[in-house]
Amino acid sequence: MISRFFRHLFEALKSLKRNGWMTVAAVSSVMITLTLVAIFASVIFNTAKLATDIENNVRVVVYIRKDVEDNSQTIEKEGQTVTNNDYHKVYDSLKNMSTVKSVTFSSKEEQYEKLTEIMGDNWKIFEGDANPLYDAYIVEANAPNDVKTIAEDAKKIEGVSEVQDGGANTERLFKLASFIRVWGLGIAALLIFIAVFLISNTIRITIISRSREIQIMRLVGAKNSYIRGPFLLEGAFIGLLGAIAPSVLVFIVYQIVYQSVNKSLVGQNLSMISPDLFSPLMIALLFVIGVFIGSLGSGISMRRFLKI
């Protein structure tokens, strides 16, 4: 069994070398196909991840007017410290909503610090200026469906300047994810079909060049599985070789994109898929797809031209 495998392996490698240019064309086709598959898969999976993150961040941001001190029990008035009659009016109105899970205060100073962390040196141009941000309440909803209701009710509360919710963004992101998924998978399927076709032609040339040898093998009683072996290995090798470059690109490029993009998402409680999880799974998937389309192309040629 082992000796037969190595014999098939040797025949497959010899055939790949013999049909050099066709092998290069088939490997290049697989490489381009898998590279584009990796790109589409990265976009599809991360878009779905971001859409899920947004949906899970079932919250509304309620900004307080600058002339309202809702989170302070005392205020400065005419040089004196007096009791704040507006204390927690907005907070209590939000907290008393039946659809609200929690309400958390976020001062404009805290928001300024977060923006400084996210923007880095770009935010330094505003140093020395008055803080343009607003105090806000972060309202967490009991369920995603409650977000719009909370946002509408919050707009009616006196002292509220603006209300933001992720409903529209989530809906747009889901539409984008659906669009990318449909067209991305369609294009990937077309590319895989082209790769299978080229591999099939490469194997066909090998079959034609060895047709007499194959006929003799059949006459002396060689089993179909024995005849198929070298050709299936040849197709698998083409797929395997074509998966190497896309896998290297995934490992390097995804790390760079993650480090560049993800830090701007963290401030919004969003995140791309971690490279430690995504890269190994994507690389394994590329090799599996490569071997599959290589073997499939080989199988199609054998079925069509050998009739075995």
Curated annotation (Swiss-Prot):
Residue intervals on the Extracellular side: 46-178, 258-276
Primary subcellular site in the record, as a coarse category: membrane
Subunit record text: Homodimer. Interacts with FtsE; forms a membrane-associated complex. Interacts (via large extracellular loop) with PcsB (via N-terminal coiled-coil domain). This interaction directs PcsB to equatorial and septal sites of dividing cells.
Oxidoreductase in keyword set: no
Keyword set includes Cell cycle: yes
Protein name (Swiss-Prot/TrEMBL): Cell division protein FtsX
GO aspect biological process, one term: cell division
The protein's role, per its UniProt record: Part of the ABC transporter FtsEX involved in asymmetric cellular division facilitating the initiation of sporulation. Required in maintaining normal growth and cellular morphology.
Phenotypic effect of disruption: Essential; cannot be deleted.
Phenotype upon changing F126A: Shape defects; cells are significantly shorter and rounder
Family from the record: Belongs to the ABC-4 integral membrane protein family. FtsX subfamily.
Domain of life: Bacteria
UniProt topological domain (Cytoplasmic) ranges: 1-24, 200-236, 298-308
Outcome of swapping E109A: Shape defects; cells are significantly shorter and rounder
Pfam families: FtsX, FtsX_ECD
Effect of Q111A: No shape or growth defects
GO CC list: plasma membrane
